[in-house]
Every structure is written in C-alpha cells, then in structure tokens.
Amino acid sequence: MSLTAAALAWFVLASPASAATADSVRWWISSADLKQQLAEQPVLTWQTETSRKAPRIEINPTVTFQTMLGLGSSLEPATCSNLWRMSAADRERTLERLVSPSAGIGMNLMRLCIGTPDFTGDPWYSYNDLPPGETDPELKHFSIEKDRTYILPVLKLARAKNPELLFFASPWSPPGWMKSNRTIIGGQLLPRWYPAYAEYFVKFIRAYAAEGIPIYAVTIQNEPGVDRAQEKNSKWQYPSCHWTGAQECDFIRDHLGPALRRAGLNTKIWCYDHNYNVKATGDDPGLAYPRTILSDPRAAAFVNGVAFHGYAGDPSGMSLFHQEFPTVPIYFTEGSIFGIKGGVKLIEKLRNHAVAYNGWVTILDDQGKPNNGPFDASRTLITLDPKTRQPTEHFDFFLYGQFMKFIQRGAVRVNSTAGSRNFANVAFRNPDGAIVLVVVNPTAQRKLFTLAWDGRTVTVALTARSVATLVWAAGKP
C-alpha cells in the first residue's frame, strides 16, 4: 500500500502498553493479505477458567530470560539512497513510520555500514582508499566525505524522528592497502596493519559522533568466514575480508579494545557477526569462532556480546552458545524474514536468547535496486517506484510492527507455552509492567487458542496467515 493519509490512521492511538488495563486485553492483527494492517480488534475481557479444548498458551512471568536491547533493520546505502530519491515529504513520513514509537512501528536499533557493503549503487569504497602501491599508516587521508551525500542526512533525520534510536556498525572490508591482496574484495588484513585498523575504527566513531550520530557498537567484520576474492565468477565478488577466530581475538585483545579505551570511547564490541551453525561448513566458521575469542579472558574483557546471522544453521545454535557463555549477550544482526513464515523465524530468534533483532535491507526499488552485489533480495519492507518515486509498504512492514511497536527496550522475555512452526508465540514483560504476547499463525486455517494468565483466560480466534499482538497490564515487576 502506498503512503496516504488513510494509511496513517492506524497510528493514531495511545501507547499500546500504557493503555493496557488489568481487566482486559487489547490486541492488534496484521494479515498477509493486507486486509488488516496493525488493526486493533475488540477488547477481550478476562474470564474464569474455560474449556481446555482449544490449544493453550500459558504465561509464567516468574520464569525469565533475556532483556531486550532493541529491534530494527538496516540503514545501509541502498536504503538511504532510496529514501533520498523520495520527495522530502515522503522521506520524512517514511522514516517516521519506521522509527517513531508513537507515529510509526518504533524501530529502535539500526545497523549501519562502515564503508561500502554489497547493497549500494556506488563504486566500492572504504574511508581510506589510496592509489596502488601507497600506504597511510597515520590515516592522514581518512574521510567519511562519501557518506555526506545521502547517508548522513538520512541518519540525522531518522535520529530526529526517534532520539532513542541506537546505531551499530559493521565493515565489509578494511582499506585495500591494509590487506594481503591489496583490494577491497577478499583477502585478509595483514597483522602489521592491526594498529592502523584499530585507529580506523576510532576515527570512524569520532567522525560520526561529530555529525550527531553516536555509534553504540561495532562488529569487526561482516561475515568473516567469507573471502569473495576466491570466487571465479566476478559477479560473486564484493567487499569482504577473511578472518579466523584467533585473528579476531588478537585484534580485539591487543588493538581495538585498547584503542577504544585510550580514546575514551564507550562504543561496544560485538564479535563474530556470522551464521549460527554449530559446526564449520563451507564459508561458515561455526561456533568455534566466537568461542575462541571469549575463551581468552583478555579479549573477552573487551567484548560486549556475540553477533549472529541466520543464513546457515538453526537458531538453536544461539541457545547452545548461551549455555556455554550464559552471561554474554546474543545479538541477531542480519537476516531477512519475507512473509508470514518470517514471523515464525523472528520468534525463533527471540526464543533462542537474542537480545536484539535486525533485518537486512529495508528499502529497495521495485527492480531490487540499488544493488552492486550478487544477491537478489526478495521484496523489502518498503519498495520505491523508480518512476513516480512513491514508496509502498508491504506485509513485512506490518509484521515487523507487530513486534517492534509493542516490545520496549528493557523488556524481559517471560516463559510462554512453546508453540511450533505452525503456531508460534513469544512473550515479554515491558518495563512499564505490561505483558506483550506475539502469536503467528502461518497456516491457511483459522486458529482458535486460549490465553491463560494468573488463573484467568481469554479465547482468541486468529485468522489464517496472520500475526497478533496481545497486551495487558500486569503491574510493575
């Protein structure tokens, strides 16, 4: 659906959590056919125990799990470029709908790129590119100038729409002159340039802070198991840099961690940033990679958490890692959901200890552009008509909203009856005391279920291929 005044109507409501009461349940639905878009339903009233014929979802707030940092997507160059192609009014409205907690779906954590990723229409670049054969150990030529065209203006506008918005950032490659093959595509960072690369991070964080964009956290490398220089087909070559767990451990322990501390920066380090498969397969290093880093006490002292992607393995890999390192936060930093089954996938991340969820690529045009990389993205949350420059929202936008508009920063996941991939759920207790339950029905059949809480129940009918969010007051924890 295109952005129109009518489309904004569902945003005109009180804060869902604060408006909840102890005697009733408010709830909202989005359906894959878009007949319902974060549409509020008639209020449900708690009843005494009812028939147990319908499947039950029981909530036990005394059993708790992770505390949430945030939920969001990415403001990578492709998304920023498409936002910049819109009219000023559409750009403001679209960002408001993405990040505003009151007038939008309330994304509060966004992934940025340090230099260029694959999803861009511009030539590949780092912040310290040099002619062949030259080096710059003191980083005298460091510059974020290329980000000033449209990336930084978009980020500033997003932060104006939500001052609580947090940004974390990932590089796809160090500058080519620092690497074994002297190119931004593939290869490895040479150890002699570890000190300079640590300062590269410091300069990036300071430069963005000077523009009013504080960087909450960084990862060392997007998908460090990948070396795209090894691809024979040039189509598959894009910025990348291969690291081992031991190399990243050395870099964090001896260089980046100390450099951030010397600079007086509070930016956090999230290690790994690759798939959650348990064992190494192909380009995927497996859990041995972050285990190597966190098993070194001096490196672990600088690490705030582990970042995972979802392109290989199973989300249960995050739970296995949590069992081994129970005090280390787990961040899901890249994945795409695509449709109602994506709602089940998002729940699986949250039920496997992720304290954050970030999708990847928020807005492409309806031709899948801009994109200089090899991966074709399915339809993004919002697409842009390249002729009219009008944005259109798709189901995934509303699906995200069913989670992100309701689950607050600082929410604690509470125990709820385990579902299945045909009927999934996850529950949280917000800092204001409200309980939030998200339920996904990816099947073609209407589902009836009973929600049980504190000796009372309500019965809910969830339409086919839809997601529901239920909110009620439970008092301050």
For each predicted feature, which ranges?
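Conserved, mostly hydrophobic/aromatic
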Residues: S73, G106, F167, V218, ...
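Aromatic/acidic polysaccharide-binding cleft in carbohydrate-active enzymes
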Residues: P329-L399, R413-A418
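C-terminal beta-strand-rich structural cap/linker in extracellular carbohydrate-active enzymes
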Residues: A461-P477
